[in-house]
């Protein structure tokens, strides 16, 4: 047996409105659903980015889902979104146009990455296809 893919990535933030606006308006993720003060669910290609407010999910004992979250120490997450190499400069220009600070750019082999932070300090990476041997 083998897993077929990672379906969702969960991050935690008390700034749900800012995070929703950041990912939709700056990165073009698609809105799926939200529960005011608890979560925002966004679609990123063929996977989901789930943003939870840990102040709600840590005490959410009546939910059908297990209690989860991270507040102390602040949870800083890193995740990567795959982009086409042909769109690399377009993405870089879009980030600059939206005044998003690019912390680092890397080129390793044939792969290129751009690193920046979202409003909650999570490290977001835009990485070109074929960086990892997952499509083989």
Region spans (language model):
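N-terminal beta-strand motif that seeds the catalytic metal site of vicinal oxygen chelate
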Residues: 1-17, 76-79, 83, 130-136
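Short, charged/polar, Gly/Pro-enriched secondary-structure boundary elements
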Residues: 47-50, 59, 121-124
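Short, low-complexity disordered segments enriched in Ser/Pro/Gly and basic
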Residues: 72-74
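Residue-level marker for the onset of beta-strands and adjacent loop->beta junctions
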Residues: 7, 37-38, 77, 102, ...
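Mid-chain, well-packed structural core segment of small domains
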Residues: 80-92
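Short, flexible, mixed-charge acidic loops at enzyme active sites
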Residues: 55-69
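Vicinal oxygen chelate
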Residues: 1-2, 92-136
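Core segments of cupin and vicinal oxygen chelate
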Residues: 12-56
């Amino acid at each position: 047996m083998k897993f077929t893919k990672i379906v969702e990535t969960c991050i935690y933030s008390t700034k749900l409105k800012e995070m929703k606006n950041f990912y939709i308006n700056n990165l073009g993720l698609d809105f799926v659903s939200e529960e005011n003060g608890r979560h925002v669910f966004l679609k990123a290609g063929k996977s989901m980015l789930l943003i939870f407010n840990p102040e709600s999910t840590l005490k959410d004992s009546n939910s059908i889902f297990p209690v989860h979250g991270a507040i102390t120490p602040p949870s800083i997450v890193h995740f990567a979104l795959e982009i086409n190499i042909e769109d690399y400069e377009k993405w870089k220009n879009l980030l600059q146009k939206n005044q998003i600070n690019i912390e680092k750019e890397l080129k390793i082999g044939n792969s290129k990455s751009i690193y920046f932070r979202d409003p909650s300090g999570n490290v977001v990476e835009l990485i070109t296809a074929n960086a990892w041997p997952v499509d083989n």
